């Protein structure tokens, strides 16, 4: 009798994707983040679903409904904080996942990489709209400032902003549509993630050395399922430590004040995971220029495969490129810090220098250093 997992159509599909999948024998813990992102997505959908049962998308009751969830709903506080901090864990895993793709040259799988960039944009849009829903001061002003950036688009900008707002300012219509989009987008993300996996399984996984591993494959189960479970336990441990000991560590105190259109907070800033892009936006004095730089800071990932000049795929044996990569990481941390600081003397200059450095590393220095390495290795 044939094993059911190899004969049943549905089980066969799962088997080919997660059980008998041939995987390189040398992939490291950096390859755990894909499965962790899947877990984060499931966790966010489930906690979000339970929050949506009690939340009301109306400007007069949104803030109160979140308070009600935390105070009166059974275990509402833990669901709310798991959802809020789960978003932070999601972005930590996302940044690690993208960083791993850049370091080990996984971007040469162009279809998988491009779907990944689309996923990144969709997750960022979802997180932004989710931040608006509690209707605190930072929710309201964050929504006003970020949506207002679209007015920089020539000719259609103002009409576009008013169309998104559903009126002449961020109000009830805006909140209702943001809730609708925030609810539907995770399911679109799930579909895109399935396509991401589909393209990945067409080529097979990359590995740290960057060489073809067809001659040395091992089954995904039990080797990598066990490895992924360890990563999962560490993720849940970190998340629960955050939720149970300092749930507001990554939030903004201003968001505990109900939204007031008549009172602007002294310093408007988004969640920590958008601060690097926000710092790039603020470093350019021109509005349209800032918006373009903001979009390009993420969209630049799409041209990384075109700028790959090295004869080697991975950075594993390329010390110059490694130094440059870690400088890029340090630069992104600097931008994140600057994004959270007020717009005044030393921070403006640091932000501008860090922004120039960010684009210079990716567009100019990486290709040059890769070419130098080719000559040093006589390739």
Curated annotation (Swiss-Prot):
A ubiquinone binds at residue 201. The keyword Metal-binding applies. Gene3D superfamilies: Cytochrome Bc1 Complex, Chain C. It comes from the Eukaryota. Its main location: mitochondrion. Pfam families: Cytochrom_B_C, Cytochrome_B. The chain crosses the membrane at residues 33-53, 77-98, 113-133, 178-198, 226-246, 288-308, 320-340, 347-367. It is found in: Mitochondrion inner membrane. PANTHER family: CYTOCHROME B. This is Cytochrome b. It comes from Viverra megaspila.
